[in-house]
Regions:
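Conserved ATP-dependent adenylate/AMP-binding module captured primarily in the ANL superfamily
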Residues: 60-95, 128, 169-188, 221-238
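Conserved pre-ATP/AMP-binding loop-to-beta segment of ANL
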Residues: 105-107, 111-148, 155, 179-186
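Conserved AMP-binding/adenylation subdomain of ANL enzymes
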Residues: 167-186, 196-241, 245-262, 334
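Structural core segment of the AMP-binding/adenylate-forming
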Residues: 21, 48-121
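Conserved structural elements of the adenylate-forming
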Residues: 8-14, 125-129, 140, 159-180, ...
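Gly/Ser/Thr-rich phosphate-binding loop
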Residues: 121, 209-211, 229, 238-241, ...
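Conserved AMP-binding/adenylate-forming core of the ANL superfamily
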Residues: 1-44, 61-71, 118-127, 161-163
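Conserved AMP-binding A3 loop
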Residues: 2-6, 135-136, 144-171, 316-317
């Protein structure tokens, strides 16, 4: 558990540690592992002092025999610091990829013989005037992140995300969803921070609105969806974000578990899907479950965006009665329609 005050104190310490090590837009921080509190602190600490952070899909490290995508990203970024939560889990990629002179920072389980720095050491750095100066220098065009596209059409491509992009997205969200200012959001989310949906949209909604984020250690796959179910029994979100396959995996549990269904819908203001089309039958099942539990439909909406737009381009900010609607251009956004040739 981490409060906003504690997060700021620790982010400043990490920011000081990164400045002392000379990190910059030319030599950023690179993250190999999944969502975690330490991952969030590194991300916040880096952005606090104007150092870009590049979260990389853990699958590139753990599901690949040759770690080719990580090699390509490392060669492009030339990171000055590489973080992994578990040194044993990521030992393969740490040994296979040439990270140059980058400092390897590990949360736990440092492999024998590998030179590395414990993550806790970053938190020991004293934050002084240099952090204040660096923070004051952060502006709209400061690079916040390098996010990498999924690589579905080739090698992952690096996308620059500036503070202007992140902040304008959140300004648009608050204009479209004014209820966020009335009640701080409570979100349980598994969506990865190496992807724009989980990081720039969901994480930043919590950050911008003083909300509470519970990191879901489950995923919509057999053997891990059960963790999400267990977490939803304990946490009643006010907004629930997921991709269509996530809802497909969750719905059978909601249908048969009265306690889970009660917890899920107790405080729910909004159901949000994105990243793919939601089949109409799943939409109807979610509607039926909501009516069964609370006697009325829960508002369901969607959005359309891209890594390059950090991420929102269009948004549904009105009630709809079917899936497949991507909404209207978000405030500050223009969309040009071109013929499909």
């Amino acid at each position: 558990r981490l409060t906003f005050s504690e997060a700021l104190t620790q982010a400043r310490a990490i920011g000081a540690a990164l400045l002392a090590r000379g990190l910059s837009a030319e030599r950023p921080a690179m993250v190999l592992s999944d969502n975690s509190i330490d991952h969030a602190l590194l991300m916040l600490g880096a952005m606090h002092v104007g150092v870009p952070v590049a979260p990389v899909s853990p699958a590139y490290s753990l599901m690949s025999k040759d770690c080719a995508k990580v090699k390509g990203i490392a060669a492009l970024l030339k990171p000055s610091l590489v973080y992994a939560a578990d040194g044993a889990k990521f030992a393969g990629v740490l040994g296979a990829v040439d990270f140059g002179d980058a400092e390897i920072v590990l949360g736990a389980n440092a492999p024998a013989g590998m030179k590395s720095t414990p993550f806790g050491e970053l938190l020991q750095q004293q934050a002084g005037a240099e952090v204040d100066r660096a923070f004051a220098a952060v502006g709209p065009d400061t690079i916040a992140k390098f996010l990498f596209t999924s690589g579905s059409t080739g090698e992952p491509k690096g996308v620059i995300n500036t503070q202007r992009m992140l902040c304008s997205n959140q300004q648009a969200v608050t204009q479209l969803w004014p209820f966020l200012g009335e009640k701080p959001p409570v979100i349980l989310d598994w969506l990865p921070w190496n992807h724009t949906f989980g990081a720039n949209h969901n994480f930043n909604i919590v950050l911008a609105n003083g909300g509470t984020l519970y990191i879901d250690d489950g995923k919509p796959v057999p053997g891990l969806i059960e963790k999400t179910v267990a977490n939803l029994r304990e946490v009643s979100p006010t907004i629930y974000f997921n991709v269509p396959r996530g809802f497909d995996a969750l719905i059978p549990f909601l249908e048969k578990d009265d306690g889970l269904r009660k917890s899920f819908f107790r405080d729910l203001q909004l159901i949000f899907y994105a990243a793919a089309a939601l089949p109409q039958n799943l939409w109807e099942k979610l509607e039926d479950l909501s009516i069964r539990e609370r006697g009325k439909r829960t508002v369901m909406v969607s959005s359309w965006g891209a890594t390059e737009t950090a991420p929102m381009v269009t948004s549904v900010h009105f009630e709809i009665d079917r899936a497949g609607v991507i909404g209207l251009p978000a405030p500050g956004t223009e969309v040009k329609m071109v013929p499909n040739e």
